């Protein structure tokens, strides 16, 4: 973490909430942190954006995760290298009116906000459903078509390929997840090929159509209810900034506590981790950052005098430097109190395009300090 960023973080965070922060400090704070978060500018939010419960759940899981890792703790479909999740809603258009049947519908998602350099590791569409009652044929097949080429009126229908197929029980109301990785990967390579996804639902063993309101494919309710039931596209990407770490590196280190306790009284202000809270609301970011509203970043401060106790998590070079400093204080400076381990921070925020992003950022929290 760069020194100038720490300086402005400390200045901004130590400012009382009742006091106004000078505009110059605000500008420095924003210009330093936005690139750190992978953003070119502050998102501009228009209208109400509903945060999916699935992202809230993953955010809470990540914050309570046993290990300190920037990879998202997701099993199965999602690879461990993914450190960013984005959710997208269907882009409504006049084409929607052409799909009059409730069990055949085209979903279109604008994923242009995903940076081209990020690696796609998985993509899924989640569909909510209501329990169907009094049905003699409860099982349905959900066919997912990638639209390779849209149809031409009077000539031919759309050219598609099936990329996923699911059999679901209409007596259950659990969320249905369909894999759309091949389609989204192609869209990222060539945005012009994004013609959407065609979803068709059939009843298995029955001539009549499936229950009309089982799978929720299109808007048919008031906005508050639709926000909770609308289809959502989730993309899982890796921006390449988080290297895979070993189990030893992921576990939080505990300082050694040996016979060095007797040396503590010799240090007037020993090297240790100190409080530093970053308040996003103080710089006006609470309109696009959903969570956290702020976080404990901490910093390292204090003296590293000779002899350096074992619990200071030092190095052999620092021990030698402190020894020489004790003999020649004017010629050689003493070791510095610096972070020896940094942890990740999860952030849930809104994009200017209406998307919701959950991203993990490494090296944002001081976990341990030492003399180096």
Swiss-Prot record:
Family matches, as Pfam families: TGF_beta, TGFb_propeptide
Taxonomy, superkingdom: Eukaryota
Basic residues bias (residue ranges): 253-266
Keyword terms of this UniProt record: Developmental protein, Differentiation, Disulfide bond, Glycoprotein, Growth factor, Secreted, Signal
Location within or outside the cell: Secreted
Region (Disordered): 237-267
Cited Gene3D superfamilies: 2.60.120.970, Cystine-knot cytokines
GO biological process, one term: cell differentiation
Glycosylation sites: 110, 134, 173, 313
GO molecular function, a single term: growth factor activity
Signal sequence interval, chain numbering: 1-20
SMART domains cross-referenced by the UniProt entry: TGFB
Stored SUPFAM superfamilies: Cystine-knot cytokines
Entry GO CC: extracellular region
Family annotation (InterPro entries): Cystine-knot_cytokine (IPR029034), TGF-b_C (IPR001839), TGF-b_propeptide (IPR001111), TGF-beta-rel (IPR015615), TGFb_CS (IPR017948)
Disulfide topology: 271-337, 300-369, 304-371
First-listed, main subcellular location of the protein, grouped into a coarse class: secreted
Record text on subunit structure and interactions: Homodimer or heterodimer; disulfide-linked.
Known function: Acts as an extracellular morphogen to establish at least two cellular response thresholds within the dorsal half of the drosophila embryo. Required for the proper development of the embryonic dorsal hypoderm, for viability of larvae and for cell viability of the epithelial cells in the imaginal disks. Acts together with scw.
Family, per entry: Belongs to the TGF-beta family.
Name this polypeptide is given: Protein decapentaplegic
Organism: Tribolium castaneum (Red flour beetle)
Lineage: Eukaryota, Metazoa, Ecdysozoa, Arthropoda, Hexapoda
